[in-house]
Swiss-Prot record:
Residues 68-77 have a biased composition (Basic and acidic residues). The lineage of its organism: Eukaryota, Fungi, Dikarya, Ascomycota, Pezizomycotina. InterPro entries: WD40/YVTN_repeat-like_dom_sf, WD40_repeat_dom_sf. WD repeats lie at residues 21-65, 162-209, 237-271, 282-322, 351-390, 455-492, 494-534. Its main location: nucleus. This is Nucleoporin NUP37. The nuclear pore complex (NPC) constitutes the exclusive means of nucleocytoplasmic transport. NPCs allow the passive diffusion of ions and small molecules and the active, nuclear transport receptor-mediated bidirectional transport of macromolecules such as proteins, RNAs, ribonucleoparticles (RNPs), and ribosomal subunits across the nuclear envelope. It comes from the Eukaryota. GO terms for biological process: mRNA transport; protein transport. GO terms for cellular component: nuclear pore. The keyword Transcription does not apply. Gene3D superfamilies: YVTN repeat-like/Quinoprotein amine dehydrogenase. It comes from Chaetomium thermophilum (strain DSM 1495 / CBS 144.50 / IMI 039719) (Thermochaetoides thermophila). Signal peptide: none annotated. The gene is NUP37. Keywords: Coiled coil, mRNA transport, Nuclear pore complex, Nucleus, Protein transport, Repeat, Translocation, Transport, WD repeat.
Amino acid sequence: MALQPVPRMRRTLQNTQHTYSLGRRIYDVKTYPVQSPQGATILIYGHENGATVVWRGGRRLKPPKPQTNEKRNGTKPEDAVMIIDSDDETGPTFVDKPEFEDSPSVADGSVAEIIQTLDLALGTAVNHIAVLPMPPCAAEDASWNGANILKTKIVFAVTCATNDVYVITLPLTPPSHEAKARPELRKSLLAGNAGKGVWGETLTLLTGPSRSCNGVAISLVKHRSSSRSRSSERSAAQAAPITRVVVAAHSREASGTLRLWDVPLEAKPGTINRVEPFQTEYLPSPLTSISFNPVNLTQLLTVASPHAVRIYDYATASLPSDDTSEGPFPSQGSWLISLYPPFARGPAMSTSRKPIVAAEWIARGRAILTLLADGQWGIWDLDGASPTAAGGGSNLFSKTSAGLRGTAITAFSVTGHLEGTSPLRNPTTQKASSSSSGEFVPMTPHTRRDAIATAFGGSPEKLAAVRGGITVAQLPSTLTSGAGDESAVLFLGGADPIVCVIPVLSKFWDSQLRRAAGGGVNLWSGAQPTRMIRLTDLSAGLLGERCTGAVAITKAVRANASTNGILKEDDNSGSQGLPIEVLLQGESRLVIVHENGDAPTSSLTSRLLGARKKQRDEFKSVNAIVAYPPLEKPSVSFNLNLTQRPEKPGTLFAPRSRHSKSLFEQSIDTIPSTDAGDEETIPATSAPSSQQGFMFATDLELAADLPDDEADAEGRDVEQELLDIMEIDRELEQLEQARERGRKRVFFEEG
């Protein structure tokens, strides 16, 4: 089941959420860094029957052409040729030539459409997906490290529930409608399965694992002159190198296993090659996640929670005399460094470390951003990547930094906690009185807070069940002030997920360092790139499902079509709101979250106090479920005073006119009599000024006897009237809060 082209939209005060319901379970989702030739963003997600590739945005495919039948009744063409098929001959190969419209499908302020989807059926569930750690770019600029195949092919790796690991290549251009409607695909249910080459795809099977892999990573092999080759044929082959990738996968075999494969991208469509691993590492404990360095392609970041974060280099031999391998890499790599997280808090001295949820490379592979299970995040500066580092002298192992604190903890350059994670890091307080009495305790806000702290206290056993992740997206140079900037998405999953976004990592890192040094930087009222922003009201798009993943989608570009129709990046796209969109992974839904254009981006203090109210000028009625009431209209004025006051300009409530019509559209000056047989009207007498405030009481009994006017009742908007009354209450409450803030309370003790 593919994504529906039009998602279900939900708006909140902070963001807009577009929900795609798939109807089947989703195991993993990734954003491919290269755009398609027509400017679409490519998404890949795994499900119980394989993987699905989605092209989102860019220029639309042209509608399929109607099939014309050139055969005429009663005539016989002179040039008719009879073709006798034989079993040895095969039919002509279908060549797909998709055609696209000239204008892009994304207009300013609209939702990017789903241009095309393609299901790659593998007959088993795809649990994990890995893409190349390259910066986002257009198709014509995708020659990363000299790999020209990336200009025309999608290259990614998947792990399956049947212990198989595949490297898949696929054309970067989406298939046309004619290609998906070919008659040969209707002959069998298995005709369109992956591996047969009907979509131009190639599969390479990586053998070796005997259990399902828990993670996978992929990177390019950097071409270099090697002295390890022992034959002239191998040296001649290196003159015209073939693009190769290295795939790493870890599993729970034995106590933990890490395997690496060297895969050449030379398979032909319709064939499945098999590759054996060139390195196998047996570990003391299973790994949680792995990722390759985007610059130093041979370095692999491994997370062994809760012990440490370690860096493995498969190209550096563990022993200098290791020359038994005939390939370009040694038979055994080396472990370069181990980074240790802090210890968990508890009522007594704890010897358990905080579980490591995730860790990712940042600053072009020179630093590591990590997230712990109690909501703490930290940055390890390995190579002087700090924005305030002078000449690279303030890295983790410089003279000014010992690297290890107490020989057991690796010091963070900067650290903090995610918003909303205080119940995870506060240890439970054992109260002897409450534990021994056993009396019933009513649920109050204070006891509810204690219950949350008890359920999610900072004990290592309870923190081990916390799941989350980190996604780092490199930003194009046109979206930020400098080249090489990055955005990060940190999340802790669950029924009420915590998802935070760092718009620009370098500016956020710099502001944190200045704050730690007492530089006077106000993180609450600073510019948006210097703060960590938490996405709120995510349950509106997930519709009750648990959040199992979050990835970043770089905002590529908006509608500047060049001469060849390829979308180019807009310099102003990064100046409004976040430079990325967040893709949330539910159990059976995908939710794309982006910041509203009218969302307040000023100081957080003014937003919390309600001192600034944004007007929704471009609000239009949509056929969607919204998470807030419609646009507010001017409230109706009411006179709540008992005594009549002269009208004063600038007052909050204007006095009510006495000659206005009543609720039943009749004049108040003449009130019908309630006596039977008396059809004359009784003139309304003026009451004394002291009783004018209670004149409505005489109208209530008379109004109750009158029949209801159904036409007027249908025209009334009762909901709007209730909202007007609520608006009055809010205004009075804000006035009361403003008066309370300016009042100081002084207590005197009796001597």
